[in-house]
């Protein structure tokens, strides 16, 4: 597709771009006869005068028209029909661009129907994904990949994930109680690290130590578990197959925590109780455990399609986020390679998910944050309370500076703009397009220095708002003109297409714009 060729971008330092993709062009292209998926109704995209898009240096004009079909098909112009998402490469990743909670799970759930394998590569139960099935039932997943609702998909929890088994089994029990069969469809890496209750306790003690400088952790034990991994006294899933040495390793973890934190008391009885619990877990987990590095790479060699579901988001990345107010893993593109054992040159499409505005849970700098009634109005409209913690999310305008930074790091090929419907009815909408220092100097990129970030003045563009309810819209052309201009201005500022546009929580509330 002309659009796909224009949008393809190499992952910086990871995926080598082809010479063709790197060439600059000013040619104007037309999107012709490409139906796209939107749940119950489908779209046929054709050339027209509506919806100008700038992709790198390529101008594209498209008009979407709704059609009805029994399945998602596309007219290729050669008499053959193909699925609207068939242009996606063998390996596709869906990553967050902001501070999490962008709605990645919904796109993964939709795309999972077209992929053989859905894999998670990093993070733990701090990644809350909310998805809905065809009956409208809500599922809040934290460890299990969102593709689990598609019965033909195999879900993989990779080596880069930290796993709290009590929570993991609770998710499985909840899924199966609602008729979702996980047997033989859910695989756990033998290299993944186990997250124990003591990690969660230590997480809370660490936050208490920081007092007024708290990071705002979810207290799910993610950081302490990755710390155990880094100092090499962590316990891996594969260790459950060697229970004769498991207690000794567990004892070391308990003693280490007691030595570090005054509030943590070591006792042999506590170690024994944990050991007794994990003997039971070992038996139940056994049929889930595999060498996922071998499984994923074998699946790739066999031509199977692999979808990678990112947890958290780029601005929470331990290397690129607002450190130290970040997570303890790499939710950016590099985490895919280290968290699954997949070579960089095998990565294909990388879709960045961004809310039409910005939210953040917990502490840390947030330049476009809205306070008072404005922030509360946006929070209520978007139901912005954390999936994992239930904490109210901080809300603000879309931060283009941060979004461009995420695009640079990850080499996204397209953007999934979510929750556009939340902006309906607001008196005005704004985009934070630049940062300026106190002296008025415009910053070239997102700063690492938090003292600078906390003092920047955001330069905004104010755009015309729209009053119409767009939750039933399934065609880009049917969006209010003001909403289209908002989308197109974002595309101009980041140089990428907003190919997927979310207009509501349900599976069908998606416009695919080609």
UniProtKB/Swiss-Prot annotation:
Per the Swiss-Prot or TrEMBL record, the active site comprises: 101 (proton acceptor), 129 (proton donor)
Catalytic EC class: ligase
Q: Which SMART domains match?
A: Adenylsucc_synt
State how the cofactor is bound: Binds 1 Mg(2+) ion per subunit.
Q: Where is the major localization of this protein?
A: plastid
The record ties this protein, via Pfam families, to: Adenylsucc_synt
Q: Which GO terms describe its cellular component?
A: chloroplast; cytoplasm
Any idea which positions bind GTP?
100-106, 128-130, 393, 419-421, 502-504
Q: Tell me where it resides.
A: Plastid, Chloroplast
Q: Which GO-annotated molecular functions does the record name?
A: adenylosuccinate synthase activity; GTP binding; magnesium ion binding
What positions does the entry give for Mg(2+) binding?
A: 101, 128
Q: InterPro entries annotated for this entry?
A: Adenylosuccin_syn_GTP-bd, Adenylosuccin_syn_Lys_AS, Adenylosuccinate_synth_dom1, Adenylosuccinate_synth_dom2, Adenylosuccinate_synth_dom3, Adenylosuccinate_synthetase, P-loop_NTPase
Q: Which CDD domains match?
A: AdSS
Family statement: Belongs to the adenylosuccinate synthetase family.
Subunit details: Homodimer.
Q: What is this protein called?
A: Adenylosuccinate synthetase 1, chloroplastic
- Which organism encodes this protein? Physcomitrium patens
């Amino acid at each position: 597709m002309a659009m796909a060729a224009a949008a393809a971008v190499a992952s910086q330092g990871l995926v080598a771009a082809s010479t063709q993709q790197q060439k600059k062009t000013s040619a104007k292209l037309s999107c012709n006869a490409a139906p796209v998926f939107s749940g119950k109704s489908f779209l046929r995209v054709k050339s027209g005068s509506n919806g100008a898009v700038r992709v790198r240096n390529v101008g594209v004009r498209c008009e979407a028209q709704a059609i009805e079909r029994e399945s998602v098909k596309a007219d290729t112009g050669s008499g053959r029909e193909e699925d609207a998402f068939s242009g996606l490469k063998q390996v596709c990743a869906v990553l967050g661009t902001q501070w999490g909670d962008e709605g990645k799970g919904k796109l993964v759930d939709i795309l999972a129907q077209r992929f053989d394998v859905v894999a998670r590569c990093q993070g733990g139960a701090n990644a809350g994904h909310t998805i809905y099935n065809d009956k409208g039932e809500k599922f809040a997943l934290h460890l299990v990949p969102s593709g689990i609702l598609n019965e033909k998909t195999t879900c993989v929890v990779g080596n880069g994930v930290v796993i709290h088994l009590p929570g993991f089994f609770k998710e499985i029990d909840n899924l199966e109680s609602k008729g979702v069969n996980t047997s033989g469809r859910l695989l756990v890496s033998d290299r993944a690290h186990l997250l124990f209750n003591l990690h969660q306790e230590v997480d809370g003690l660490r936050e208490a130590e920081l007092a007024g400088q708290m990071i705002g952790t979810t207290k799910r034990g993610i950081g302490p578990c990755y710390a155990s991994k880094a100092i090499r006294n962590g316990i891996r899933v594969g260790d459950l197959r060697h229970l004769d040495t498991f207690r000794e390793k567990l004892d070391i973890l308990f003693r280490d925590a007691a030595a570090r934190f005054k509030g943590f008391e070591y006792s042999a009885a506590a170690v024994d109780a944990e050991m007794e619990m994990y003997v039971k877990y070992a038996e139940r987990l056994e049929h889930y455990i595999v060498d996922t590095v071998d499984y994923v790479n074998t699946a790739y060699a066999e031509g199977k399609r692999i979808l990678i579901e990112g947890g958290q988001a780029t601005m929470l990345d331990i290397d690129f986020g607002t450190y130290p107010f970040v997570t303890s893993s790499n939710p950016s593109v590099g985490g895919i390679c280290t968290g699954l054992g997949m070579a960089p040159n095998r990565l294909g499409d990388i879709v960045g998910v961004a809310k039409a505005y910005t939210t953040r849970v917990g502490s840390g700098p947030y330049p476009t944050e809205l306070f008072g009634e404005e922030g509360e109005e946006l929070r209520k409209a978007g139901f912005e309370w954390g999936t994992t913690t239930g904490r109210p999310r901080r809300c603000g305008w879309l931060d283009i500076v941060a979004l461009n930074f995420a695009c640079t790091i990850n080499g996204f090929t397209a953007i999934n703009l979510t929750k556009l419907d939340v902006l309906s009815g607001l008196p005005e909408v704004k985009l934070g397009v630049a940062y300026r220092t106190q002296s008025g100097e415009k910053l070239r990129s997102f700063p690492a220095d938090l003292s600078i970030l906390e003092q920047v003045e955001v330069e905004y563009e104010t755009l015309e708002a729209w009053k119409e309810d767009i939750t039933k819209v399934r065609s880009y052309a049917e969006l209010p003109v003001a909403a289209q201009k908002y989308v197109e201005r974002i595309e101009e500022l980041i140089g990428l297409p907003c190919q997927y546009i979310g207009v509501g929580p349900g599976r069908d509330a998606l416009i695919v714009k080609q």
